[in-house]
Amino acid sequence: MALWMHLLPLLALLALWGPEPAPAFVNQHLCGPHLVEALYLVCGERGFFYAPKTRREAEDLQVGQVELGGGSITGSLPPLEGPMQKRGVVDQCCTSICSLYQLQNYCN
């Protein structure tokens, strides 16, 4: 019993000197399979909304933006007029840094 009394302060010191716990979720760039895995973890059984654009839809969107701006793809930037584009999960979490709260917005 006396041995436990001597070890207790040592165990308390070791517990205090231990590494700090890492935050559960750090805002970060999430792309490809990492983004999908994070959405599965955040949304769980609810699932998440994901409707990728086909290559044709993406090309049509670029052509429409060029026609609005009157320039070429490699030329000047198109004007800010026109319909606003809704940002998707890839724009929000892969191109920019994404938070846990932002990921939850894509859950069903």
Curated annotation (Swiss-Prot):
Keyword set, alphabetical order: Carbohydrate metabolism, Cleavage on pair of basic residues, Disulfide bond, Glucose metabolism, Hormone, Secreted, Signal
PROSITE patterns attached to this UniProt entry: INSULIN
Gene3D superfamilies: Insulin-like
A Pfam family annotated for this UniProt entry: Insulin
Disulfide bonds: 31-94, 43-107, 93-98
One of the record's GO cellular component terms: extracellular space
Any one GO MF annotation of this record: hormone activity
UniProt-annotated location(s): Secreted
Residue ranges annotated as propeptide in the record: 57-85
Signal sequence, start to end: 1-24
Main location: secreted
GO annotation, biological process: cellular response to oxygen-containing compound; glucose homeostasis; glucose metabolic process; positive regulation of protein secretion
Function: Insulin decreases blood glucose concentration. It increases cell permeability to monosaccharides, amino acids and fatty acids. It accelerates glycolysis, the pentose phosphate cycle, and glycogen synthesis in liver.
Family designation: Belongs to the insulin family.
Subunit composition and interactions: Heterodimer of a B chain and an A chain linked by two disulfide bonds.
Protein name: Insulin
Gene that encodes it: INS
